[in-house]
Amino acid sequence: MLSDSGAGGSLDETFTRYFQDIGKGRGSSGGHYRRNSKRELERFVEWAAGERGPDEWTGIVPDDADRDPKFDDLSESVFREYARHLTSDRGLKQNTVQTYYAYLSAWCGWCVTEGYLDTHFAQRASATAPLPDDDGRRPGDQQAWTSDQRHTLTQYVDDAAYEASERLSEVPADDPDAKARARYKALRAARDRALVYLVAYTAIRIGELVRDGSDPRRRGVRWEDVSLSDGSIDVYRKKQSWDSASLPDPVIEPLRLYKRRLDPPSDQWAVFPTLHFATVSKQVKEELANRGLDEEEISTLREDSDYDIFLALSKNIRVPSITTDGARGTLKRITEDSDVDVEHSKHEYLAPHGGRRGMGEVLVRAFGYTVAARYLDNSEEMVRKRYSHIEAGELGDAAAEAIEDIDG
């Protein structure tokens, strides 16, 4: 667990761990990516310290403070200003600006996962607003998980969940510490598996599944919203109303086994509770204090349970859902660990919206735009626009057949 002083640490203190982590699962391209990422992060730190940029730029540290930039200094406005700096001050081509900002955004996401930041500032709409648009991007250019990618990713989480469960069963009962560690890993693996299957097969937007910190109405789905017997889940839609979405057969078994592993004390628990140590710890301590326990009693309970999430489960202390940033971080980790092939100009991992678009392509090709629109919770007009490359390809094939029939 990270110390509470993490947010007050300097930015470059994290670089060594970050570069070690991103080197996992990247194969021969890892060194090139790390070198470029290191260069751009060092430039960002120099800019944040006021050592880069126009003459009037003094950095993000308060004028009365003589120190290096820290995580406490970061905000949406800081990343927006840096995006503006990349766009305006360095004469870079727009695709280069997008690439350089992506290095920074990837590090910011890692910092959220590791607990240095609570919010993925770099992905906020206001932060990315100054970035140039991707000129010439066609609807078919946007990421959509392919059949091979879905299979590779789901096979990986299947194997990981099975192996974690097997390891848990092999740990002797007289080794409680090892048992707790194995139980935690089995829980996380089961949660990862359920999340991947939902993203891969339901076409539900990630903001409808998990918590969005900027919108209190999007608190993440709870078990009371899920009916495994009916194959449905109630979600708060983009159109700002509750609606039922379908749970296809491939999703049911991962969800059922995950629920059995989690064993929530009530159906009001989030389906995907955060496992972020600091967040769970804070929730547990505050709730136990509200129930009248003193610090010594709380400390004893926490020491006896090894992991705060297990204490929360045993005492029915509901912890919040994982956030949209956390879900993206989870998919990044799984993508890297699974060695799935990802070739995309904007994303180096299988992003949640790519899972949704991948299912959209399957449905449009199999059943047409009307059925796909209902499943995607979109208008048929919008679906036709976003998946116009499919119709264009089919029309091209039809034209080729017609030419062959007529011209012989």
Q: Model-flagged regions — what are they?
A:
Residues 376-401:
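Catalytic-site neighborhood detector that most strongly recognizes the C-terminal catalytic loop/helix
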Residues 16-32, 38-141, 182-184:
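N-terminal core-binding DNA-recognition domain of tyrosine recombinases/integrases
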Residues 294-374, 381:
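Short, basic (Lys/Arg/His-rich) helix/loop patches that form interaction surfaces
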Residues 129, 401-408:
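C-terminal secondary-structure termini that scaffold catalytic or DNA-interacting sites
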Residues 152-206, 210, 266:
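Basic, Lys/Arg- and aromatic-enriched nucleic-acid-binding interface segment
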Residues 115, 189, 198-216, 365-367, ...:
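A short, glycine-centered helix-capping/turn motif at helix boundaries
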Residues 61-65, 117-175, 390:
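Flexible interdomain linker/hinge and immediately adjacent N-terminus
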Residues 211-306:
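Conserved tyrosine-mediated DNA breakage-rejoining catalytic core shared by Y-recombinases
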